[in-house]
UniProtKB/Swiss-Prot annotation:
Coiled coil: none annotated. Pathway: Cofactor biosynthesis; molybdopterin biosynthesis. This is Cyclic pyranopterin monophosphate synthase. It catalyses: (8S)-3',8-cyclo-7,8-dihydroguanosine 5'-triphosphate = cyclic pyranopterin phosphate + diphosphate. Substrate binds at L73, C74, H75, M110, E111. It comes from Azotobacter vinelandii (strain DJ / ATCC BAA-1303). Belongs to the MoaC family. Its EC number is 4.6.1.17. GO terms for molecular function: cyclic pyranopterin monophosphate synthase activity. It is an enzyme of class 4 (lyase). The active site is at D125.
Amino acid sequence: MLTHLDSRGHAHMVDVTDKASTAREAEAEAWVRMRPETLELIQKGGHPKGDVFAVARIAGIMAAKKTHELIPLCHPLLLTGIKVELSAEGEDRVRIVARCKLAGQTGVEMEALTAASVAALTLYDMCKAVDRGLLIEQVRLLEKKGGKSGHYQAGQAM
Protein backbone atom coordinates (compact mmCIF):
# COMPACT_ATOMS: atom_id res chain seq x y z
CA MET A 1 0.00 0.00 0.00
CA LEU A 2 1.32 3.41 -0.95
CA THR A 3 0.65 5.56 2.11
CA HIS A 4 1.03 8.88 0.30
CA LEU A 5 -1.96 8.23 -1.99
CA ASP A 6 -5.58 8.58 -0.93
CA SER A 7 -8.45 6.36 -2.11
CA ARG A 8 -8.71 8.39 -5.33
CA GLY A 9 -5.00 8.14 -6.07
CA HIS A 10 -4.23 11.74 -5.09
CA ALA A 11 -1.00 12.49 -3.29
CA HIS A 12 -1.27 13.74 0.29
CA MET A 13 0.84 14.06 3.40
CA VAL A 14 0.18 11.16 5.76
CA ASP A 15 -1.66 12.19 8.94
CA VAL A 16 0.42 11.00 11.89
CA THR A 17 -1.59 12.80 14.57
CA ASP A 18 -2.79 9.62 16.29
CA LYS A 19 0.50 7.71 16.04
CA ALA A 20 2.46 7.16 19.23
CA SER A 21 5.76 8.94 19.61
CA THR A 22 8.57 6.36 19.61
CA ALA A 23 12.34 6.31 19.26
CA ARG A 24 13.30 6.14 15.59
CA GLU A 25 16.67 5.88 13.87
CA ALA A 26 17.89 5.44 10.33
CA GLU A 27 21.29 4.98 8.73
CA ALA A 28 22.03 5.49 5.04
CA GLU A 29 25.15 5.41 2.91
CA ALA A 30 26.48 6.80 -0.35
CA TRP A 31 29.74 6.11 -2.14
CA VAL A 32 31.80 8.44 -4.33
CA ARG A 33 34.40 7.02 -6.69
CA MET A 34 37.24 9.23 -7.92
CA ARG A 35 40.77 9.10 -9.27
CA PRO A 36 43.31 7.98 -6.67
CA GLU A 37 45.10 11.33 -7.06
CA THR A 38 41.93 13.18 -6.08
CA LEU A 39 41.44 11.14 -2.92
CA GLU A 40 45.09 11.61 -2.03
CA LEU A 41 44.71 15.38 -2.46
CA ILE A 42 41.71 15.37 -0.10
CA GLN A 43 43.45 13.22 2.50
CA LYS A 44 46.62 15.32 2.52
CA GLY A 45 44.62 18.53 2.97
CA GLY A 46 45.93 19.95 -0.30
CA HIS A 47 42.61 20.61 -2.00
CA PRO A 48 42.38 24.24 -3.15
CA LYS A 49 38.82 24.58 -1.77
CA GLY A 50 39.78 23.49 1.74
CA ASP A 51 38.68 20.58 3.94
CA VAL A 52 36.40 18.65 1.60
CA PHE A 53 35.23 16.13 4.21
CA ALA A 54 34.34 18.86 6.74
CA VAL A 55 32.30 20.84 4.21
CA ALA A 56 30.51 17.71 2.96
CA ARG A 57 29.76 16.67 6.56
CA ILE A 58 28.17 20.04 7.37
CA ALA A 59 26.22 20.00 4.08
CA GLY A 60 24.82 16.56 4.96
CA ILE A 61 23.75 17.72 8.41
CA MET A 62 22.08 20.82 6.98
CA ALA A 63 20.33 18.73 4.31
CA ALA A 64 18.87 16.32 6.87
CA LYS A 65 17.28 19.27 8.67
CA LYS A 66 15.76 20.56 5.41
CA THR A 67 14.48 17.28 3.98
CA HIS A 68 10.84 18.38 4.27
CA GLU A 69 11.66 21.40 2.08
CA LEU A 70 13.16 19.19 -0.64
CA ILE A 71 10.78 16.22 -0.70
CA PRO A 72 7.18 17.43 -0.95
CA LEU A 73 5.32 14.96 1.30
CA CYS A 74 7.90 14.62 4.08
CA HIS A 75 6.96 15.90 7.51
CA PRO A 76 9.08 18.62 9.12
CA LEU A 77 10.87 16.83 11.95
CA LEU A 78 12.64 17.85 15.13
CA LEU A 79 15.69 15.67 14.69
CA THR A 80 17.52 15.06 17.94
CA GLY A 81 20.63 13.57 16.40
CA ILE A 82 22.39 13.77 13.04
CA LYS A 83 25.78 12.28 12.33
CA VAL A 84 27.54 12.26 8.97
CA GLU A 85 30.85 10.43 8.58
CA LEU A 86 33.12 10.32 5.54
CA SER A 87 35.94 7.84 5.18
CA ALA A 88 38.42 6.93 2.47
CA GLU A 89 37.96 3.32 1.36
CA GLY A 90 40.71 1.88 -0.77
CA GLU A 91 42.58 4.16 -3.12
CA ASP A 92 39.66 5.67 -5.03
CA ARG A 93 36.43 5.67 -2.98
CA VAL A 94 34.82 7.65 -0.22
CA ARG A 95 32.08 6.12 1.91
CA ILE A 96 29.53 8.45 3.45
CA VAL A 97 27.35 7.20 6.31
CA ALA A 98 24.54 9.36 7.68
CA ARG A 99 22.58 8.60 10.86
CA CYS A 100 19.48 10.44 12.00
CA LYS A 101 17.32 9.94 15.06
CA LEU A 102 14.44 11.38 17.02
CA ALA A 103 11.54 10.51 19.26
CA GLY A 104 8.53 11.13 17.07
CA GLN A 105 5.56 9.93 15.07
CA THR A 106 7.25 9.25 11.74
CA GLY A 107 10.51 7.74 10.54
CA VAL A 108 13.77 9.41 9.60
CA GLU A 109 14.80 7.30 6.59
CA MET A 110 14.40 10.16 4.12
CA GLU A 111 16.46 12.45 6.33
CA ALA A 112 19.32 9.95 6.48
CA LEU A 113 19.16 9.32 2.72
CA THR A 114 19.07 13.06 2.02
CA ALA A 115 22.05 13.69 4.31
CA ALA A 116 24.14 11.00 2.59
CA SER A 117 23.10 12.18 -0.88
CA VAL A 118 23.82 15.86 -0.29
CA ALA A 119 27.15 15.08 1.36
CA ALA A 120 28.04 13.10 -1.80
CA LEU A 121 26.86 15.94 -4.04
CA THR A 122 28.94 18.41 -2.03
CA LEU A 123 32.03 16.24 -2.32
CA TYR A 124 31.37 16.07 -6.08
CA ASP A 125 30.95 19.84 -6.32
CA MET A 126 34.15 20.55 -4.43
CA CYS A 127 36.21 18.08 -6.47
CA LYS A 128 34.80 18.44 -9.99
CA ALA A 129 37.44 21.02 -10.96
CA VAL A 130 40.23 18.51 -10.31
CA ASP A 131 38.38 15.32 -11.36
CA ARG A 132 35.62 15.32 -13.99
CA GLY A 133 35.17 11.56 -13.69
CA LEU A 134 33.66 11.50 -10.19
CA LEU A 135 30.91 8.94 -9.75
CA ILE A 136 28.24 8.94 -7.04
CA GLU A 137 26.99 5.41 -6.51
CA GLN A 138 24.98 3.13 -4.27
CA VAL A 139 22.90 5.53 -2.20
CA ARG A 140 20.82 3.27 0.04
CA LEU A 141 19.17 2.77 3.39
CA LEU A 142 21.32 0.56 5.62
CA GLU A 143 19.12 0.32 8.69
CA LYS A 144 15.90 1.62 10.17
CA LYS A 145 14.72 1.17 13.75
CA GLY A 146 11.43 1.99 15.44
CA GLY A 147 7.92 2.72 14.34
CA LYS A 148 5.08 0.50 13.21
CA SER A 149 7.08 -1.38 10.58
CA GLY A 150 9.84 -2.24 13.08
CA HIS A 151 13.46 -2.96 12.34
CA TYR A 152 14.92 -3.17 8.83
CA GLN A 153 18.49 -3.92 7.85
CA ALA A 154 19.81 -3.85 4.27
CA GLY A 155 19.95 -7.32 2.82
CA GLN A 156 16.93 -8.55 4.78
CA ALA A 157 13.63 -9.35 3.10
CA MET A 158 10.89 -6.85 3.82
